[in-house]
């Protein structure tokens, strides 16, 4: 072996050993459960698992993979990842996840293809990739079974999130380079002209207008958003709603207390109302007509009012105007207009406020999860923002940042703003 090649091999060995040592140290730090510091068992103030350790462990695992493969082969990881997603989505569409025995008993490709009415050789080709990286297990020649990871896809909430990401946002993200080429490297600022509209050829419509033409797709996206909010309710409790409302003079039962603007199917406002039990006033959910009409469950003690983010806020004088995961869908100029429409409804600048529940990204060391979410929102003109970006955006709408409530275990935060 030539000296240069030998030195390169030795360098790779050192890198692999270093990465293994890093992983071992992180595994020792990995915690299974963190005591919740919340209002009750149903509403923790922070995630049960410290995500910072989870993400650091995943990051070091990827670094180990790169060290093992080396620079050249690592480039092709991207191709493998895309093909893996493609194969999983195809198998999902064929019905493989539902057809395999849920008790993890093995099934041959022949039996599976016959059950599904699909081509056996095609099935084998797709399962190759999905047994190398998962989620399925290859238990024999052209014989497969479920694993704990593939069974997760049978959860409707997981299913909707997977479909929404792969069918709606992945095509848009893969067109980002083309959008930037067409627009001279400038980020999208118009919801009718962005990577999403380019990928899906929406004919001048924004994402929501486009999806409204396809009820099944729209239902999947709305269900995915509901699943995300339902699975992660704890950020709502970062803001001390009860304490804030109790500091105000007593109100009548007709006074608007909290308005959840763009609140989807009411997950957040339901949590807030529970936190504020016994306090007089109205709790209001606002969203687009089709969203409110599609809520499948009863919202006790919560009013529903149709709204348009880009028109003046219809309910004046509320104690708290709440925006959760709304502004990250929009470019900065649009966010300013949304906040200004809320400002038009504020009648007392000293007591009434806006609370924004969004990510506040660190200036460095952003996790892969947060970076992924940021690029997903970029596809429709939005952004996950840093503190510096929020402190530029909010004053541009005439507000000041009073407090930022956050958790060390996540980038999620609650930004309290008052009108100047």
UniProtKB/Swiss-Prot annotation:
S-adenosyl-L-methionine binds at residues 262-263, 287, 308-309. Keywords: Methyltransferase, S-adenosyl-L-methionine, Transferase. Its EC number is 2.1.1.-. The active site is at residue 328. InterPro entries: COMT-like, O_MeTrfase_dom, Plant_O-MeTrfase_dimerisation, SAM-dependent_MTases_sf, WH-like_DNA-bd_sf, WH_DNA-bd_sf. Pfam families: Dimerisation, Methyltransf_2. Pathway: Secondary metabolite biosynthesis. One of its GO terms (biological process) is secondary metabolite biosynthetic process. One of its GO terms (molecular function) is protein dimerization activity. Belongs to the class I-like SAM-binding methyltransferase superfamily. Cation-independent O-methyltransferase family. O-methyltransferase; part of the gene cluster that mediates the biosynthesis of oxepinamides, derivatives of anthranilyl-containing tripeptides that share an oxepin ring and a fused pyrimidinone moiety. The nonribosomal peptide synthetase (NRPS) opaA assembles the quinazolinone core with D-Phe incorporation. The first adenylation domain (A1) of opaA loads and activates anthranilic acid whereas the second A domain (A2) is for activating of L-Phe, which is then converted to D-form by the E domain. This is O-methyltransferase opaF.
